[in-house]
Design a protein with these regions (language model features):
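Short polybasic amphipathic segments
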Residues: 1-9, 163-164, 200-206, 288
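Amphipathic, non-transmembrane alpha-helical segments in extracytoplasmic/periplasmic proteins
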Residues: 34-36, 66, 81, 93-117, ...
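An acidic/polar, Gly/Ser/Thr-rich interaction patch typically located in mid-to-C-terminal regions
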Residues: 17-44, 185-352
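Soluble periplasmic/extracytoplasmic beta-strand elements of cell-envelope proteins
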Residues: 65-67, 78-82, 165, 200-204, ...
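A short, compositionally biased
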Residues: 1, 45-50, 149-151, 159-160, ...
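Assembly/oligomerization scaffold segments
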Residues: 1-91, 177-190
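Short beta-strand-centered interaction patches in the first periplasmic/extracellular domains
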Residues: 76-77, 83-84, 120-196
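Conserved "cap/hinge" positions at secondary-structure junctions
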Residues: 56, 168, 292-294
Length: 352
């Protein structure tokens, strides 16, 4: 771990004087975070804004800046650093005149001198919108959600060792299988229809005619079978009065496909395989396979039959919404993963 002091530019290798390293990434709205402990040193000074670089072998795993230091009576010092995504909390005035996500991303990164790279762009032009005093993250989130609704593609913004990248989340899939016989040591799993589950979508518009009367147009999409199982769970949303009937109908169907399901949550504790540098590809936004047998049924696998009538196992891809790598020492590396199904991402909850 290298530290470059923000006040005098001096560079120190602090690998031998730090402990309890944790690196956390989240899929939505949070910067990558590095925390560690060290002791007071007369030579080493950790100032706010100091740059930190962390490598595992030849692989760069964190590049960021010190934002917080704290100490206690015993002289223990806790340091918290964030990657470049922290600067997406900056607020801005921005007029989106109708442009692609990549165009907005490039403009905002350039304005705030952030290193960036566009890995993939959908070329989808989002509707115009004015942002007054909104965070850069919210400005970009608007375009991310518009792409999800308009193109059915989920784009993610993440920091890759000092470069903020825009990418299709499908490109972050890994081949890792985590479960009963691979890495996992404990888990917590739940299924629920109590939150963010709807089997009936009501969309409506409101406008006034020449006499001032309010005219309302409604469109309903529903799943009658699931209503028999769960009762009626309705979500009502007002949409733009300029939307066409076909747009409203399509929007209602899209929302029903997103919300008409049980919500599954899964948290896994795991141990990394020693000397596996690729394990750092397991981060928020990455896709992994799950293979767990639980009291509520198998997680991540389903029994199927192929064309020849033979039984087969189908694996489902899951997305990591939050990931923490914890390093006690070089030989003890653990992970804590919060998992969501690939078919339901946080941005899908945005709706209109």
């Amino acid at each position: 771990m290298l530290l470059q002091n923000s006040e005098n530019g001096n560079v120190f290798d602090i690998t031998s004087v730090v402990s309890d390293i944790q690196i956390t990434t989240e899929i939505e709205g949070q910067a990558g975070k590095l925390t560690f402990f060290t002791l007071k040193d007369d030579v080493l000074k950790i100032s706010s804004g100091s740059r930190l670089q962390v490598k595992w072998g030849d692989k760069g795993i964190f590049f960021g800046y010190v934002f917080n230091t704290q100490t206690d009576k015993k002289g223990n010092i806790k340091v918290t650093a964030y990657d470049q995504l922290r600067y997406l909390k900056n607020t801005d005035f921005y007029i989106n005149k109708g442009e692609t996500l990549a165009q907005t991303f490039e403009k905002e990164c350039t304005k705030f001198n952030l290193q960036y790279k566009i890995e993939e762009d959908s070329q989808y032009v989002v509707p115009p919108k004015l942002f007054d005093g909104k965070s850069i993250y919210d400005i970009l989130k608007y375009s991310v959600e518009a792409n999800l609704r308009g193109k059915k593609k989920y784009y993610i913004i993440y920091d890759d060792y000092g470069t903020i990248k825009l990418n299709n989340i499908e490109n972050l899939r890994t081949g890792y299988v985590i479960g009963d016989y691979s890495m996992a040591t404990d888990y917590r799993y739940s299924k629920s229809i109590d939150k963010d589950t709807y089997n009936q979508i009501l969309l409506f518009t409101e406008s006034k005619d020449d006499s001032g009367r309010i005219i309302s147009n409604q469109q309903i999409a529903k799943d009658s079978d699931n209503q028999k199982r769960w009762g009626v769970l309705q979500l009502a949303k007002k949409v733009n009065e300029k939307a066409t009937q076909q747009e409203i109908t399509d929007f209602a169907k899209n929302l029903l496909s997103l919300y008409n399901r049980e919500r599954e949550t899964l948290t896994i504790n795991a141990i990394a395989i020693p000397n596996d540098n690729d394990v750092w590809d397991i981060r928020a936004g990455a896709g992994i396979f799950i293979d767990i047998s639980s009291a509520l049924g198998d997680i991540g696998t389903t029994q199927t039959t192929d064309k020849e009538g033979k039984k087969a196992i189908k694996r489902e891809m899951y997305i990591i919404s939050r990931c923490t790598h914890a390093l006690k020492n070089e030989n003890y590396h653990t992970l804590r993963l919060d998992i969501i199904k690939e078919t339901m991402t946080p941005q899908e909850k945005a709706g209109g």
